[in-house]
Amino acid sequence: MATMLINHMLFLTSLLIVVFPVANAIPARDIDKLCKETTDVPFCLKYLGTDPRIPAARDLTDVLLIAITQSKMQVDDATTHIDRVRRKFNGPHGRRRIEVCKTNYGIASARFHTAWELGLQKSFWDVEKLARIGTNAVIDCENVWRRDGPIQTSPLTFYNMNVFKLSGIILLIFNKLVT
């Protein structure tokens, strides 16, 4: 009898662990609907809609945390890219611009990390503020390539635009959470 009870409890616990997150997951149609409210639907569907963590997301707070994580991943990838391309920019303007981007991506990384931590605490206004600061640092990295000297093509435009678009998604989710 005791063995049957233990087996039954293990089965129910396993069932709860496996089924509970899925049963309470945010429906995929809600993610599609959210993405349709963004300025770049295919981008949103690519980065949020296909994220393997989305099926386990219970609510918009979890989706917000995933979007912040996606931003942090883009920032980290850009930082790695900076290290790879830095030697291609040996002129004074290129070196200065790469250093501005390296510094700004350091700021963005720290801000998105803290935003994620505050998102866990549901401190949404602080999340919004930090996501803006991180995004503005990335935007400045894009803009520095057009300031103070000859215009150059930024080697980080891909990452800069991804962070900018993810920021729009973060702000959209933020607005839904606070209104």
Swiss-Prot record:
InterPro entries: Invertase/methylesterase_inhib (IPR035513), PCW_Enzyme_Inhibitor (IPR052421), Pectinesterase_inhib_dom (IPR006501), PMEI_plant (IPR034086). One of its GO terms (biological process) is regulation of seed germination. It is found in: Secreted, Extracellular space, Apoplast. Disulfide bonds join 35-44, 101-141. GO terms for cellular component: apoplast. Keywords: Apoplast, Disulfide bond, Secreted, Signal. Expressed in seeds, buds, and mature flowers. One of its GO terms (molecular function) is pectinesterase inhibitor activity. Residues 1-25 form the signal peptide. It comes from the Eukaryota. Its main location: secreted. SMART domains: PMEI. Pectin methylesterase (PME) inhibitor that targets PME from seeds and modulates PME activity and pectin methylesterification during seed germination. Belongs to the PMEI family. This is Pectinesterase inhibitor 5.
